[in-house]
Curated annotation (Swiss-Prot):
Induction record: Expression is up-regulated in spores.
Species for this entry: Plasmopara halstedii
Function field: Secreted effector that suppresses pattern-triggered immunity (PTI) in plant host.
UniProt note: domains: The RxLR-dEER motif acts to carry the protein into the host cell cytoplasm through binding to cell surface phosphatidylinositol-3-phosphate.
Recorded superkingdom: Eukaryota
Glycosylation sites: N46
Protein name: Secreted RxLR effector protein RXLR-C04
Pfam family, one: RXLR
Signal peptide extent: 1-22
């Protein structure tokens, strides 16, 4: 018995949780039927929902690093937040949900000062 066949059988059993679907006939019929399942299985996955919170946290962290380093950029971003109606509490909640509030609390305080000065 070929080692590659053993890997295919084990992977099929793990994927389907069904020993009957691991027979050579079942594996070959799925591949030979022309549905392209064997070559397109990765294209059918939708990982954007799983990785979306991580991407948002990374974008927030990059943005906050730029704000911390560049005061002119900070004023521009604060102006955008104010223009879009973001309150201090909403920004605190956003950073809290991403786990960034502890590290970047000073930026929220600077945003509160910006809001007070712009009114």
């Amino acid at each position: 018995m070929r080692l590659s066949y053993i890997f295919v059988v084990v992977a099929t059993i793990i994927t389907n949780c069904d020993i009957a679907s691991a027979s050579l006939r079942a594996i070959m019929s799925d591949t030979a039927s022309g549905n392209g399942l064997g070559t397109r299985i990765l294209r059918q996955t939708n990982d954007s929902d799983d990785l979306e919170p991580i991407r948002h946290a990374m974008l927030d962290m990059e943005l906050l690093e730029k704000i911390a380093k560049d005061p002119k950029y900070a004023e521009e971003v604060f102006g955008n937040w104010r223009h879009n109606g973001q309150t201090k509490a909403e920004m605190e909640n956003r950073l809290q949900s991403n786990g960034l509030l502890g590290k970047y609390r000073f930026i929220i305080d600077r945003y509160a000062e910006h809001l007070a000065n712009s009114e």
